[in-house]
From Swiss-Prot:
PANTHER family, per the entry: AUTOPHAGY PROTEIN 12 (PTHR13385), UBIQUITIN-LIKE PROTEIN ATG12 (PTHR13385:SF0)
Top-level division of the source organism's lineage: Eukaryota
InterPro entries in UniProt: Atg12, Ubiquitin-like_domsf
Organism this protein belongs to: Phaeosphaeria nodorum (strain SN15 / ATCC MYA-4574 / FGSC 10173) (Glume blotch fungus)
Membrane disposition: Peripheral membrane protein
Sequence similarity: Belongs to the ATG12 family.
SUBUNIT field: Forms a conjugate with ATG5.
Record's keyword annotation contains Lyase: no
Cross-link annotation Glycyl lysine isopeptide (Gly-Lys) (interchain with K-159 in ATG5), location: 130
Protein name: Ubiquitin-like protein ATG12
Principal location: membrane
Residue ranges of coiled coil: none
Any matching Pfam family: APG12
């Protein structure tokens, strides 16, 4: 073996734990904050929200602009619905914006996008905001 090659040391079975099992702390119950967090973990507050679709620029207006959607749905549900209602072809694009501020990802949950009374989604046939 050359001087440049170093060997990786073998595992040493003589390693001692810093504490013995008798000296370690065993929790008999969880702290209050952890217990409360675990009670609500996994249970999503699924409710219906109002979604208002608003055309931007020269985008065609829908006859029905307001509909209800469960908060556990993804944003792509809105985009697919909109594409179907507008009759958009596969090679054409629809650009959607929440509150005329940002374009969420298609996999984003709708429940995290709204606040207040309704979710306002602006849509355009060409990029509307830089």
């Amino acid at each position: 073996m050359s001087a440049q090659e170093e060997r990786i040391p073998e595992d040493d079975d003589t390693t001692e734990a810093p504490l013995t099992m008798a000296a370690s702390v065993v929790l008999t119950n969880l702290p209050r904050d952890a217990s409360k967090a675990l009670e609500t973990a996994g249970s999503l507050n699924v409710q219906k929200i109002t979604v208002r679709l608003h055309p931007i620029g020269s985008a065609p207006a829908l006859t029905q602009r307001v509909f209800k959607l469960s908060t556990n749905q993804r944003f792509d549900t809105i985009v697919r619905f909109l594409r179907k209602r507008l009759g958009v072809k596969e090679h054409e694009s629809v650009f959607c914006y929440v509150g005329s501020v940002f374009a969420p990802g298609l996999d984003e949950g709708v429940g995290g996008l709204w606040s207040g009374e309704e979710l306002v989604v602006g849509y355009a046939m060409a990029p509307a905001f830089g």
